[in-house]
Amino acid sequence: MASEHSFDISAALDKQELKNAFEQAKKELDSRYDLKGIKCEIDLSEKESIFKLSSSSEGKLDVLKDIVISKLIKRGINPKAIKELSRESGAMFRLNLKANDAIDSENAKKINKVIKDSKLKVNSSIRGEEIRVAAKQIDDLQAVMKLVKELDLELNISFKNLK
């Protein structure tokens, strides 16, 4: 048995689930009766995890956003992890949605502070885009997991490398 157990907290998104949500949203876009005859498009930039929505109507643009968000939820991606980057209007209305797939330094410090303030017997350290949490007892690690899940963060929090 290991003398010290640990795990990593990250906000990494499963790129395949993101792509699956995109494919499902595109399929629903093709079959939705209320979107027939209206020029609507959904594109995904996989490298940057950006959904590019465009429509000839601003109201339908919000419908497209709702479709994408609902498909992300069904694929297990937290809707809070989706940020609206830009909204453009003109002949076509455009909206860019970015899937936040990294813990920024501000959120990392916030998570680290909450863990330290919890008075649990754990050590936490920020390692780039991840936070490593180590403890002698697995029960303490599970308490930290519960604590982090209860935080209202705009991230898709995941726990990995539980050792």
From Swiss-Prot:
Under Pfam families, the record lists: DUF520 (PF04461)
Q: Which CDD domains match?
A: YajQ_like (cd11740)
- Gene3D superfamilies named in the record: 3.30.70.860, YajQ-like, domain 2
Disulfide bond sites: none
Task: List GO molecular-function terms, semicolon-separated.
Answer: nucleotide binding
| Record's keyword terms, sorted | Nucleotide-binding
Protein name, entry field: Nucleotide-binding protein Cj0374
**Biological source species:** Campylobacter jejuni subsp. jejuni serotype O:2 (strain ATCC 700819 / NCTC 11168)
User: What does UniProt list as this organism's lineage?
Assistant: Bacteria, Pseudomonadati, Campylobacterota, Epsilonproteobacteria, Campylobacterales
